[in-house]
From Swiss-Prot:
Cross-referenced SUPFAM superfamilies: RNA-binding domain, RBD
Name by which UniProt lists this protein: Nucleolar protein 8
Record PTM text: Phosphorylated.
Location of Phosphothreonine modifications: T302, T381, T795, T888
Residues where Phosphoserine is found: 268, 298, 304, 331, 365, 378, 432, 723, 801, 837-838, 843, 845, 890, 1036, 1082-1084, 1099
Gene3D superfamilies registered for this protein in UniProt: 3.30.70.330
GO BP term, example: protein localization to nucleolus
Presence of keyword Phosphoprotein: yes
Numbered residues of crosslink Glycyl lysine isopeptide (Lys-Gly) (interchain with G-Cter in SUMO2): K225, K314, K1057
InterPro entries named among the record's database cross-references: NOP8_RRM, Nucleotide-bd_a/b_plait_sf, RBD_domain_sf, RRM_dom
Compartments (UniProt record): Nucleus, Nucleolus
Region of interest (Disordered), residue spans: 223-304, 435-470, 499-533, 590-908, 932-982, 1006-1026, 1071-1105, 1145-1167
Amino acid sequence: MKVNRETKRLYVGGLSQDISEADLQNQFSRFGEVSDVEIITRKDDQGNPQKVFAYINISVAEADLKKCMSVLNKTKWKGGTLQIQLAKESFLHRLAQEREAAKAKKEESTTGNANLLEKTGGVDFHMKAVPGTEVPGHKNWVVSKFGRVLPVLHLKNQHKRKIIKYDPSKYCHNLKKIGEDFSNTIPISSLTWELEGGNDPMSKKRRGEFSDFHGPPKKIIKVQKDESSTGSLAMSTRPRRVIERPPLTQQQAAQKRTCDSITPSKSSPVPVSDTQKLKNLPFKTSGLETAKKRNSISDDDTDSEDELRMMIAKEENLQRTTQPSINESESDPFEVVRDDFKSGVHKLHSLIGLGIKNRVSCHDSDDDIMRNDREYDSGDTDEIIAMKKNVAKVKNSTEFSQMEKSTKKTSFKNRENCELSDHCIKLQKRKSNVESALSHGLKSLNRKSPSHSSSSEDADSASELADSEGGEEYNAMMKNCLRVNLTLADLEQLAGSDLKVPNEDTKSDGPETTTQCKFDRGSKSPKTPTGLRRGRQCIRPAEIVASLLEGEENTCGKQKPKENNLKPKFQAFKGVGCLYEKESMKKSLKDSVASNNKDQNSMKHEDPSIISMEDGSPYVNGSLGEVTPCQHAKKANGPNYIQPQKRQTTFESQDRKAVSPSSSEKRSKNPISRPLEGKKSLSLSAKTHNIGFDKDSCHSTTKTEASQEERSDSSGLTSLKKSPKVSSKDTREIKTDFSLSISNSSDVSAKDKHAEDNEKRLAALEARQKAKEVQKKLVHNALANLDGHPEDKPTHIIFGSDSECETEETSTQEQSHPGEEWVKESMGKTSGKLFDSSDDDESDSEDDSNRFKIKPQFEGRAGQKLMDLQSHFGTDDRFRMDSRFLETDSEEEQEEVNEKKTAEEEELAEEKKKALNVVQSVLQINLSNSTNRGSVAAKKFKDIIHYDPTKQDHATYERKRDDKPKESKAKRKKKREEAEKLPEVSKEMYYNIAMDLKEIFQTTKYTSEKEEGTPWNEDCGKEKPEEIQDPAALTSDAEQPSGFTFSFFDSDTKDIKEETYRVETVKPGKIVWQEDPRLQDSSSEEEDVTEETDHRNSSPGEASLLEKETTRFFFFSKNDERLQGSDLFWRGVGSNMSRNSWEARTTNLRMDCRKKHKDAKRKMKPK
């Protein structure tokens, strides 16, 4: 038997809670070997056990299993009925079996495959041999890693037509053997919802990580070399793109250089050294003009606002940190060196301090261009880096940050002009072929001093502009200044002697600026503090920057002409400058120099307020733009172009708070944003003239000129103090010049940069507010007459509207002095209360007489209440209490009226009351409708009266409770039973009553009638006493009905027999035990009548006996006379027979039912 045993899993249900595993094991062990018992208890939400069952693994034979189930199934055990079944197989057990079966199947298949290979003579795909061993007997089959046998393949190369031989044994070292056991179960706890994946873009997108959007990369256009080439720096065309190809040709360097010079704003704001990495590229000015022409269009197409925003943000971070020592080796890729290739460390660090990294491509002409470690191989790289770092430590970071800010400001102005002049210079250079590294550096210097304003912001643009500056443009610019013609030898001498200029160059990034600064110093040194510095050499970077700043302030007049010429060039963000031919450029430069001279003279006598007002005009970008086609091109943009110009002017004159909403908004972000946006806004059509553009710009700025005057007066910048030197001949030219001077002065006050930025933001907000208020004023004036209500009492709340008085005041302020006062006023308006209404204005406009007039709503007692209520709200005009809030006559006032009755009225009322009392006593009538007016008035209901429980007078409104406790049902039932009890009648009483029945009946009749008339409340009260007072009368009435009919009118007893219905007893009150005459049986009425006549003559003893017999209760008693006629409704003679037949039938039915039940039981028994 044991051999046939199988392991079965049984389900045992219906267990009680106190059954243990041991109990189950003992119970089932007699049928087989119990290997495992598992008891499971299901509980409800409260933890109470609901169902208990068990699984038992038992090794048992089939016969024993049947026996076990037949014996134990449906049996009761410890309070539960067992239910035994074969349980479903455990899924773990089934899984193990499936795996074993799969494993066995797999083994069979492998053996089958091996046999098949042997039969067919195929290759054994698993051989133990060194990878690369050829399979004997099979050509081009080799053993690879893990003993796999793979064929040698001949594959076509993807990029070439050549077919290569692929030996798998030589490319198999990255193969991994994958384990066969895939059944490693991962616990649920280690599962995750995260999608694992690499860093490829699809995996990142699946995880929800999206990279920042980057515009398409700059296109680099190849330009053919020109015969003459000067060093041009290849700048990274975009902030995030680093040029990583050292073997770039000179052409490519030049074209990169030109790309950046055209779009200087892109690279300029990026302080990160990576963006400015310049590889070892030789300096060349290869076909610059053609490169510019191409790039001006192509680069502009790929430019995006996102890039601009990125660059602006980076430049802002740079301004905040102003840490020049960060990545010095990379951040200053260019070093200015002398002929002996010794680095001018001070220059490097002036660059570093300004945060101008590789952007300063324009190096001092005095010093040779000292290339960065990566850019220049002739210098010792380690030495250069060391020198840079040492100087960085020496310099004062604070000074540099200030200078950086100031130079950034000026850079915007010079960008446009420098760009144009740069372009011309490039053309000139190509003709002259006299470009060398030194001369290139000097020209960059010359250009820098006018573009000194563009130094920090245009640092990168300067580096881009460093490519080439032509002598012709330089001569044209210097025509109006103290003219100094410099040869290369002179420039070399200057590089050795005057180190200040190189520093200026490095700062300003405009190559032309530095030479011009020198000339400016020579010519106008008496004006400016630069004269102080000129005498000695500036070695330390801080000194260099300071001297540069001072020189720039005083020489602003000279610089501005250049700046005006240069600005179009910088401004040509979209390559506008490249659209024109060389000849037109040169002519325009000459004319612009002449007009610049006029600007200088006019500036000396110009009034600062006029200048500040005019700064908003478009000429900030280039006052001489009339002659310059580049400027015309810029101005052709129309109103769009006004914004950049305004931006620059406002930035230059920091006093001004608002030029136009658009410009001020853009300005508030960062100075860099202005030139960038200005460049972006340039259109490529270049035929519009300055006159038309001036009109537009002046129109746009007219709104804010007055406010600009005020702010320029209050700003207190040194530039404004110096500006009175300028004359107001040409307002447009003055604007640019004055903006330069302001930017120079802003260098002096660089520490207040953040405060000024905030002021600019406020100015932008003010401009917007002003525009809104102008609209509001128009709407207000248009709608002023539509409001019919008087001004002193508005019927509706006006949200956020300003009254006419306020608008008039603001308009007068705007006209007279719209400065800080206007700002404060507008701020006050914007921060006003939510419910500002014209009440505020009317309160100011009210006369004192109206203000102190006695208001009728505050008179009297109700007025006093209203006054107290008003005092809670204070002077808040939103909660003014007027006559609408007065209460109507209150209860107290009514009482006062009652108190004011005259004595005569009171006496009259008393007399009336007495007369009424007399009438009531005589007639015994309760007159409830008294004519007392006071009581009527007091009882009259008024909606306005509010019940106040604290007031004694209000007690009249309270409903008084009945003092009598409500009787419970039990008490009422008890009373009813007591009333039903038959009273004990004494013979004396009966005797007395029998003597005078008529009197008794009369009294009962009277009382019954009276009781009928009395209300229910009184009736209840009189119920008990009457019972007690006259029990004999009641019983006698019950006993001898006396023949009178129950009615409200006197009825004689004579009518007894005529009346069909009569009442035996008179109801005294509502006596419960009295029977209802209607319930009496009609069949017994005649008997009663006869009985009555007999009873009247009977003796008292008989009467008592009869009374006991005839007392009737509501329920029937045995032998009740009322049931005598019921026999008629019963079955007659055959009733006994029917009963017997019914009983016989029922017994038969019972017998049949029992028989069927027994038969069914017998059938159900198992055979």
